[in-house]
C-alpha cells in the first residue's frame, strides 16, 4: 500500500501536476487521539503510543517517502541547498498538544535524521538537499505554546504571515509573499469545523518561472486542504483518510484481541500492549531514576517520579488553583467540582468518577484478588495495596516530612501527617458542622447520620459502615492472624494491633497530651484522655439521653436498655454484654492471672487491675478534679467524685423511687428490699449484702491488717480505713457541705451531715417503726430488740452492741488516750471528746435552738434545752409512773424508791 502511493506521487511530479490530495504523509500513518480519548490513557499506554509512532516513522523511512512528509514542497529551479521548516508540522504540533505528551517527544528521536530528495528523473537535475532542523519550529515558539500564547493559528490565518520570520522561512520573494498573504487572509474565513478537519500543506514555491505559488493554496479550492477519506468502515459507515485510523476504529467492532498473555491469559489489541503488560509478571524495570536509584517499568512513570525531586507540578485546576504532578490527577480532581461519576456498578448501583475505582470496587463483589505477595503469598484486590504491603517486608520509607524529618512508606500517610503540622481540616459535615482532615473520614462520619451500612458479611449477614470493619470482622470467621511479633511470636489479626503491641517491648509512648504532659501508646487513648480536660461527651444515648466520651462505651450502655448479652461462657452458660467481661470471667474457671506486679510479685487477672495496683507503689494520682483539685488514683474514682459536685444521681430504685449516684449503691440498696444476703462468711456463716463486706469481715477472723500508715505505723484491715486515717495527719477535709460550708474528711460523713439539713431519715426499724439517718444507727437499734452484743472484750469478757463501744472500752484497760489537744496538751480516749474539748478554747457553739436562738457547745445540751420549749418528759419512773424532762432528774427520783444508779 505504502509503495503504491509513493509511486503515484512520483508519477504526479513527472506529469508536472500538483501533488494529489491524498498523498501519504507521516500524519496518515499516525494514530491520533482526541483530548477526551487521551485523558483515559494511563502512563503505560501513553508510553506505548510513543513507541508505535516511532515505529511508524521508521516504516515510512524504509519506503523512502519520509522526505515528502517532513519537508515543505520545494519546487526547485536548481538553486543551492537551503534549510526550511515545515510550518504545517508546527501547526499540527500545536494543535495536538494533549496532556503531558506532545509530538515534541517523538521529534526528539528523529530531528537529526537527514533526508535526501532526488530531483525528478525526467528533468535530470539534482534536487537541492533539504535538512530538517526541527519538526516543530523553534523552541521559543514551542515554549510560547506551553505558556498559553498562540502566535500561530491552527489554520492559515492573519497571524501566520506575521510570524513567518520566527519560523525561519528564508528567501521568500515579494510576489510569493503577496500571494501567501492573500491566501492566508482568505483562509481566515474558513469555519472552525473546517479548520479542525483540514490538514493544510503549505507549498512555498522557489520557482522563477511561470509556476508561482501552487493554486492549491486558494481557499475556493478547499478540497486541497481536505484529505480524501478513502478508507470506509463497513460496520458503521464512517470513513478515514488512512488505514491505521480505520484499523484503530475497527477494533471495537471486531473485538479482535489477538495477543494473549501466557501467564494470566489476558488479551490485548496490540503487541506493544502485551509487551508492556508482561513487565508486571517479570518485574522488569528498565527505567531508573538518577536521583534516588528507583526503577520503573515505564518511562512515563519515571517522568512523573522525577517531579517528586524537582517539585514541578505543571497541571493546574482552573477552579481552585490547585496544582498536580500528573494530568490524570488533575482530571480526577476536576470531577470533584463537576460531581460527575460516569462509572456505575451493575451490582449495587454505586457510581465512581474513575474507571479504576469501579474495577477495584467490583472485586468486592467477586472476591477476586489478582495481586499476590511473593514473600508471604498474601493476595490483594489492587496493585497499589500490594505495593504498600511490600514495604512492610522491605521496611522502605520513601516519603519524608520536611517539617520534622519523619519518614513514611505511603504518600497518603505523609499527606495525613502534614495535616498535624498545619492543623487543616477542610472537610465539613453539613449535618453537625464537625470538621475533618480527610475526605474519607467525612464520608465515614456521614454514615452515622444516614445509618448506612453498605458492607455486609456473607457468612453472618452483619453489616458495617466501613470496608475496613468488614475486613476485620471476616477474620473472626477465618481465624486468620497474619501479623506476627518478632519479639514474642504473638500473632494478631490486625496490623494496627501488632504496631501497638510492639510498643510494649520498646516502651514507646508517642502520643503526648499538651495539657498535662501524659504520654500514651495509642492515639485513641490520647483522644479519650483529652476529653477528661475538656469534659467533652460526644456520644448520646437516644433512650435516656445520657452522654459518653467514647462510642464503644455508648454501645455497651445501649445493651442496658436492650438487655442484650451476646457473649456467653461455654463453661457455666453465664452471658455478658461485653467481650472483656467474658474474658475476665473465663479466668475464674481457669484461675489464670497473667499480670504480675514487678514490685511485690502480686498477680492479677486483669491488666487494668495491675495498672491500678502499681499506683499504690508509685503514689501516682493522675486523675484530678477540675472543681476542687482533688487527685485520684483511678478514673472511676474521679467520675464518682465528680457527681458530688454535680449532684447527679442517675440510678433509681424501682421499689421506693430512691436515686443513687452509683450503680453499685443501687444494687446494694435493692437487697434491702429483697432481704437478700448472697455472700456468706465461711467461718461464722454470717451473711452479707456485698462481696466486699465479706472480704472485710473475714479479716476479723484472720486478724490480717495489710494496710499500714507510714506516719504512725498503725495498721488497718481495709484500704479505705487507711485513706481516712491519713487525713488525720494531713488535716485534709475534701468534702464540703454546700449548705453550711462545713468540711469533712469522709464522704460518708458528709452524706450523713446533709440529712441534718434535709431532715431525711431513710432507715426504718420494722419492729417499732423508728427511723434513722444512718444505716449503722439502724443496725445498732435492731440489736436492742434482739439483745445481740456481738463485740466482746478479750480482757473482761464484757460485750457491746457496737464495735466503736468495744474500742472505747479497751482504752479503759490500756489507759490509751490517743487524742491530744494542741492548745493545753490534755489527752482523750475518744475523738468526740477532743472535739468537744476544742470548743472550750475556741468558744464555738455550733448548736442553736430554733425557738429562742440560744446556742450550745454540745448537741446533748441543745436536746435537753428543747424540752423546755416542748414540755416533753421522755424519762418515766417504772415504779410510780412519774415523768421527767431529763434523765438525771429521773435517777435522782428513783433514789426515793430505793433504786440505786447501777441497780
Curated annotation (Swiss-Prot):
CDD domains per record: KRAB_A-box
GO process terms (BP): cell differentiation; negative regulation of gene expression; pancreas development; regulation of transcription by RNA polymerase II
The protein, known as: Zinc finger protein 808
High-level lineage: Eukaryota, Metazoa, Chordata, Craniata, Vertebrata
Zinc-finger in keyword set: yes
One GO cellular component, as annotated: nucleus
Disulphides: none
Chain spans, region Disordered: 121-154
Native source organism of the sequence: Homo sapiens (Human)
